[in-house]
């Protein structure tokens, strides 16, 4: 009898996260109004080194402010708009961001 070994470490994405070549789309748990429009999903582009450096300057040593600046830039929202998101949806954005910047093969 031959035994077949299957690699079960393949990571699957949650149904609320869609990965593309250019970024991720995050489906929100709670719809929110952005610029007067009811929104149920946000698209985050992949960050560049310039994005990261600009957010570091904007944060001026404050990690939370740096993250808000970076996420706002990548999603196209102001800090005030990001702050209106429910925490669960902000965590989804964060998960999407780390999916973009972490190595797939590590």
Spans of features found by a protein language model:
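Short, surface-exposed, charged amphipathic helix/loop patches that serve as local interaction elements
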Residues: 2-106
């Amino acid at each position: 009898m031959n035994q077949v070994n299957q690699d079960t470490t393949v990571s699957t994405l949650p149904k609320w996260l869609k990965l593309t070549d250019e970024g991720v789309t995050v489906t929100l748990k709670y719809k929110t109004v952005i610029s007067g429009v009811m929104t149920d999903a946000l698209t985050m582009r992949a960050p560049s080194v310039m994005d990261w450096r600009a957010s570091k300057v904007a944060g001026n040593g404050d990690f939370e402010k740096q993250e808000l600046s970076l996420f706002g830039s990548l999603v196209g929202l102001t800090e005030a708009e990001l702050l209106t998101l429910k925490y669960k949806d902000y965590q989804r954005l964060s998960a999407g961001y780390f999916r973009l910047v972490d190595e797939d093969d590590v």
